[in-house]
Curated annotation (Swiss-Prot):
Pfam families given in the database record: Forkhead (PF00250), Forkhead_N (PF08430)
GO terms classed as biological process: anatomical structure morphogenesis; cell differentiation; cellular response to starvation; chromatin organization; hematopoietic stem cell homeostasis; intracellular glucose homeostasis; negative regulation of cell population proliferation; positive regulation of hepatocyte differentiation
Domain of life of the native organism: Eukaryota
Protein's recorded name: Hepatocyte nuclear factor 3-gamma
InterPro entries: FH_FOXA3, Fork-head_N, Fork_head_dom, FOX_domain-containing, TF_fork_head_CS_1, TF_fork_head_CS_2, WH-like_DNA-bd_sf, WH_DNA-bd_sf
Organism: Rattus norvegicus
Biased composition (Gly residues): 81-92
Tissue note: Liver.
Amino acid sequence: MLGSVKMEAHDLAEWSYYPEAGEVYSPVNPVPTMAPLNSYMSLNPLSSPYPPGGLQASPLPTGPLAPPAPTAPLGPTFPGLGAGSGTGGSASGYGAPGPGLVHGKEMAKGYRRPLTHAKPPYSYISLITMAIQQAPGKMLTLSEIYQWIMDLFPYYRENQQRWQNSIRHSLSFNDCFVKVARSPDKPGKGSYWALHPSSGNMFENGCYLRRQKRFKLEEKAKKGNSATSATRNGTVGSATSATTTAATAVTSPAQPQPTPPSEPEAQSGEDVGGLDCASPPSSAPYFTGLELPGELKLDAPYNFNHPFSINNLMSEQTSTPSKLDVGFGGYGAESGEPGVYYQSLYSRSLLNAS
């Protein structure tokens, strides 16, 4: 009995490690504290994946906890947000935009000009024509045209200098407008402007939005065409005459120019200093009736005037130093010594025969 009791005591010691299911209690872990949030995280509580109350460390159900104390906003908020924007607030915590933002949106829209001040869809020629046709005398001065346009269209009350220059340009460079001088009974400044009688109906059925055709005076057009054709004809005629002159100059042979008469060689010799510059007499007068042996027959005519011929070089040795030829350095002898001349001639002939 006692042993069994002892065994039960040992068994109780071993079975104490396995408690019953009803006696098991899950431990309650304390809620961990979060680090202080910065100002950026406090502004947007919806972006956080965790509930605003904190994190639960244990997945098991826990006992009832005390309700959390209300927390104050941890960081500053934007000035444009409402007072309800806090850490525990919802998306509706962002306040409505202030009146300054609404006013800025209204100013962002483009300023739209009223219809009465819009630019009229008429050209300057149309405006001038309307003003002149509605005048009692069918003519107006330049200042009256300006005033009529500004009274009818408020758009032209601004930037007057720009469109008034265009009006003057249209009056001056269009043939449909004619300048009329003032009559003595209507004194004043400036001439009148009227429509040309032949301009007719320039616009389609009185609609001034588009002109039917541009009016031009036929006289000016004819003068312009004639001047253009005359200019073209003159240009073509001058080009043709220049071509003819060039062709004549090419086809006509070049005429020899007259050479001035040369002065006698004796005078040039006297100017040089008394030297004998007379050309040697030709060999034809001396040998017309002379019969020479076969070995002494004359060769074909030879140019004795060549400065480097053998005849000139040999004659330089026989001639005296004071009687040199000016042209070729001592050719031949004086006219009074024919022997020396024939001696040089025969020596040349013998050299050629050999």
